[in-house]
């Protein structure tokens, strides 16, 4: 089977094909004996499902992808001008064309340390920071540095499937703790206490959350830290969506601010917060105030792991100090307004669709989860789960969404909210038509709580202008 490597490629991006029918037992002919490692069978769980959907989109309709976690694909969300100028200047200087320290350029590490130093705590130093090839490598180094024999890590459910892939890659076992949709997708801390054993080396905390769109309150962050301190459990904090929040009453705060003695390995990047995933630069920050990670050799392990890739591009590292110093508040506010407008639009449209609901209003990140009622849809074989829904929506309406099963959230669908309003409206027109065709004839009665939420959001939507891009906001300001 030949599959597309980038389903839903847009704006002139070509899809690359991969042959999945390569023999699994190697090549042994004419004296050759070439065999692949078990890594050939290791991939992001999303790929297993999405690859089956490739080529199934209705060819008579334009493809609308509500699946890609790349905020740049539609072209209406742009990085801050100052960031682009810093990078252009770094390349033009022609003094950053060589290698730098494998853990990162000192100036970049100093800038990251200054940005993430917390008040009333020992200031971070350059030695506490490791520059990485995107946030993915920062996560990989965090996992690998803790990968002792028999180790297990606690992962969120629903959660980003890369965590699971990294555990497999580094020989780490994993257990899933539950997030609670009835309480803003907060962590069920009783679950954490139950799952932690003598081989548990860390817990992954993703805030703001992919795929849930949750932003944890200060109260909940403190409760997480209190629990982890009692359990002597280090935290791997995936904060790549830092500062991407929609509610001023619940702003993003790093968990390291409340961690006490708990060591925190915090990862982030320019990719989502600055809308530059293709620049491939991230960082891993050790908030190790009691030197627990250092004494255990974890810090040394991360330093040695950095020698494998020699770090992200040197010119991008050189631009980091200037990017962090730039005044971009207006740009960030405008970007968040675009995302919030798309989120509100989705909630308003979902309220009109039989069988779909929004259990929890997104508070940040770039995603939302829709809950589907499997009994609301009819099928020939009597089954209608989230995977079936996503496949049929693609084949009939050429709208691509990710089934919640990709994130260990069966019965849900994940949508991105980085889509321009005109394409988002068209996608929802198709989703609504699809659900009408496949719905079981029955009455749907929303709960009073859902009515209040939806009516309130519709009111908000009607009171605000439709915002399609940062440029629209600039014209209005």
What is each residue range found by the language model?
Residues 170, 230-231, 262, 353, ...:
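Helix C-cap/helix->beta junction micro-motif
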Residues 321, 336-347, 358-375, 411:
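Conserved glycine-rich beta-strand-loop-beta hairpin in the small C-terminal domain of fold type I
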Residues 14-134, 141, 311, 323-329, ...:
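N-terminal small-domain helix-loop-helix segment of the aminotransferase-like
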Residues 49, 66, 112, 129, ...:
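Generic structural signal for small/hydrophobic residues in well-ordered secondary structure
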Residues 2-4, 10-11, 114, 118, ...:
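PLP-dependent enzyme catalytic core of the Aspartate aminotransferase-like
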Residues 92-226, 243-258, 265, 424, ...:
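Conserved core of the PLP fold type I
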Residues 4-8, 12, 18-24, 257-340, ...:
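Conserved core segment of the aminotransferase class I/II
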Residues 63-65, 267, 357-363, 405-406:
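Short beta-strand
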């Amino acid at each position: 089977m030949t599959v597309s490597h980038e389903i839903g490629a847009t704006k002139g991006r070509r899809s690359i094909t991969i042959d999945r029918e390569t023999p699994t037992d190697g090549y042994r002919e004419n004296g050759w004996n070439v065999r692949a490692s078990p890594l050939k069978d290791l991939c992001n769980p999303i790929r297993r499902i999405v690859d089956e959907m490739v080529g199934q989109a209705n060819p008579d309709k334009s493809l609308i992808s509500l699946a890609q976690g790349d905020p740049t694909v539609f072209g209406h969300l742009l990085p801050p001008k100052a960031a682009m100028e810093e990078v252009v200047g770094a390349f033009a200087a022609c003094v950053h064309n060589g290698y730098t320290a494998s853990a990162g350029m000192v100036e970049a590490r100093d800038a990251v340390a200054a940005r993430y130093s917390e008040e009333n705590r020992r200031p971070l130093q350059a030695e506490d920071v490791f520059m990485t090839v995107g946030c993915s490598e920062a996560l990989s180094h965090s996992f690998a540095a803790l990968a002792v024999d028999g180790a297990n890590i606690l992962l969120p459910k629903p959660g980003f499937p890369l965590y699971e892939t990294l555990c497999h890659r580094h020989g780490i076992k994993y257990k899933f703790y539950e997030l609670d949709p009835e309480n803003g997708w907060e962590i069920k801390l009783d679950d954490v206490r139950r799952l932690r054993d003598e081989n548990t080396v860390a817990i992954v905390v993703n805030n703001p959350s992919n795929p849930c769109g949750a932003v944890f309150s200060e109260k909940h962050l403190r409760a997480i830290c209190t629990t982890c301190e009692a359990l002597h459990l280090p935290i791997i904090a995936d904060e790549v969506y830092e500062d991407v929040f929609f509610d001023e009453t619940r702003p993003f705060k790093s968990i390291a601010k409340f961690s006490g003695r708990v060591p925190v390995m915090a990862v982030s990047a320019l990719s989502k917060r600055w809308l530059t995933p293709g620049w491939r630069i991230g960082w891993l920050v050790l908030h190790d105030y009691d030197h627990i990670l250092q004494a255990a050799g974890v810090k040394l392990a991360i330093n040695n792991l950095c020698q494998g890739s020699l770090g992200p591009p040197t010119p991008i590292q050189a631009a980091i100090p200037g990017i962090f110093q730039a005044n971009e508040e207006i740009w960030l506010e405008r970007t968040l307004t675009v995302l919030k407008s798309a989120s509100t639009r989705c909630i308003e449209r979902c309220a009109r669709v039989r069988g779909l609901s929004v259990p929890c209003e997104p508070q940040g990140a770039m995603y939302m989860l829709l809950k589907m009622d499997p009994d609301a849809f009819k099928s020939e074989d009597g089954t209608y789960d989230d995977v079936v829904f996503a496949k049929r929506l693609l084949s009939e309406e050429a709208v691509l969404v990710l089934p919640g099963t990709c994130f260990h959230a069966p019965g849900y669908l994940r949508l991105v909210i980085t889509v321009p309003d005109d394409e988002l409206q068209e996608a929802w027109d198709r989703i609504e038509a699809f659900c009408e065709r496949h719905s079981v004839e029955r009455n749907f009665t929303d709960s009073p709580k859902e009515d209040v939420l939806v009516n309130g959001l519709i009111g908000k939507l009607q009171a605000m202008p439709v915002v399609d891009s940062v440029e629209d906001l600039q014209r209005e300001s």
